[in-house]
Amino acid sequence: MKKAITLGVSIFLFCACVTSNVVKTDKSAIKKEVNTLLVNWHKAASDANFKEYFRVLDSTTVYIGTAAEEIWTKEQFANFSKPYFDKGKAWSFTTLERNIYMSESAKIVWFDELIDTWMGTCRGSGVLEKKEDSWKIKQYVLSVVIPNDDIQAVIDIKKKNDAIFLKRY
């Protein structure tokens, strides 16, 4: 009987030790890592560092700009952007605030940010995926922020261009 009890206790303790060794996801460390990546990504544009800027974009990245027709693959966005980087001045986005969220698996992260740009205050949002040991930006969306009280004036300005764009559909 003592052997059965000892065996039972041993199995219980072994199982308890095995389950306590499970690595828990440190969400605050992941958020810090992603935040640093995004800060450095925006800095790479400010520094006109083409290689570093595009290094963190996944091969399947989609970059969505402020104009209706601006939906670019990584390659298309790189081709559009290269002349700006080559001149030594791409763009400068300064983060005002950023919120970072993540999936339960902590392999997918999404964020929103308010940024100060040459267009004034804008909103960026995006999705990152953990691939092997590094994060890759899968999608980034840049939107111009318009106060609700000013939206009618913007709608009036956009009508002509929207009509031209909508003829495609």
Describe the predicted segments one by one.
Residues 78-121:
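Surface-exposed, charged secondary-structure patches
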Residues 68-71, 115-118, 142-147:
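Solvent-exposed loop/turn segments at secondary-structure junctions
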